[in-house]
Amino acid sequence: MERAAKKEAVDALKGTFQSTGVAIVAHYSGLTVAQMQTLRTQMKQAGASVKVSKNRLAKIALEGTDVASIGSLLKGPTVIATSNDPVAAPKIAVEFAKTNEQFVILGGAMGTTVLNPDAVKALASLPSLDELRAKIIGLLVAPATKIAQLTNAPAAKVARVVQAYASKGEAA
């Protein structure tokens, strides 16, 4: 790899690391090309990405970023999964590791917080940001719906009483 190509690779990685919410590092030795392609596809669908690069270049790119702490995990054949959603990359990585023994999660970082493999698994068990937003909106909308039902209930009762008198008057 020429010096200019290395500089370009480092700059691209640095941009990725600076804009990511979470980074997960895993060993991928022994995975087939098809398995790696499956991982890339799943990550892309979840809004995450997977990068395989030379460890030395990745360590240089990590310098000065929030996730610089993962540099110590870069030993051997490693893959780095990143996403803006703090749950997307860990969730896909943990699910993929369950079905592929060769894929071993080493750890990661969420901002400046270092994550060990157990913390990555715990993070993966959390609902995504979109799911949390939906729950919050549901909680906010529920009281408004109940208030609307309560304010409409007296009017409905009055209408039923009037209807009952009208029916009684017709019957007489």
UniProtKB/Swiss-Prot annotation:
Part of the ribosomal stalk of the 50S ribosomal subunit. The N-terminus interacts with L11 and the large rRNA to form the base of the stalk. The C-terminus forms an elongated spine to which L12 dimers bind in a sequential fashion forming a multimeric L10(L12)X complex. The gene is rplJ. Keywords: Ribonucleoprotein, Ribosomal protein, RNA-binding, rRNA-binding. Pfam families: Ribosomal_L10. InterPro entries: Ribosomal_uL10, Ribosomal_uL10-like_sf, Ribosomal_uL10_bac, Ribosomal_uL10_bac_type, Ribosomal_uL10_CS_bac. HAMAP family: Ribosomal_uL10 (MF_00362). One of its GO terms (molecular function) is large ribosomal subunit rRNA binding. This is Large ribosomal subunit protein uL10. It comes from the Bacteria. Belongs to the universal ribosomal protein uL10 family. SUPFAM superfamilies: Ribosomal protein L10-like. It comes from Afipia carboxidovorans (strain ATCC 49405 / DSM 1227 / KCTC 32145 / OM5) (Oligotropha carboxidovorans).
